[in-house]
Regions:
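DUTPase catalytic domain/fold
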Residues: 1-147
Length: 147
């Protein structure tokens, strides 16, 4: 039985894209760029990682910016923290493909090459408030839970 982890989405085959932790005490798994991406000055782009994540019903995957991105790549994760819900995995809209929403904070073009580490992903548990009666079902992919 699978508990939590990462898989490639069907349109990618390079297993080097599968996230891993770099050190024994690291909380985050490094997600990589799956498609060469050019980010124009000031532009916000969705950077494909080529992976999806599965987890338990009371877990979430948080995406955090790498601390070196602003300094070394002049990029920031524009939504500060990405939230990947468990029901995003395998959705009919995009299989659960995880994207990093990055902004170029310079007046220069930034090029992201395949295999570059772009964000960190951290699994965590979450709590439900008393009286919560959420019973909706995800019907789409990226950004689809809003009304």
């Amino acid at each position: 039985m699978k508990i939590r982890g990462f898989e490639l989405v069907s349109s990618f085959t390079d297993e080097n894209l599968l996230p891993k932790r770099e050190t024994a005490h690291a909380a985050g798994y490094d997600l990589k760029v799956a498609v060469r991406t050019v980010v124009a000055p000031g532009e916000i782009v969705l950077v494909p990682t080529g992976v999806k994540a599965y987890m338990q019903p009371t877990e979430v995957l948080y995406l955090y910016d790498r601390s070196s991105n602003p300094r070394k790549k002049c990029l920031v994760l524009i939504n500060s923290v990405g939230v990947i819900d468990g029901d995003y995995y395998g959705n009919p809209g995009n299989e659960g493909h995880i994207f990093a929403q990055m902004k170029n904070i310079t007046d220069q073009e930034v090029v992201l090459e395949v295999g570059e580490r772009i964000v960190q992903a951290v699994f965590a548990t979450f709590l439900i408030a008393d009286g919560d009666a959420a019973d909706g079902v995800r019907t789409g992919g990226f950004g689809s839970t809003g009304h």
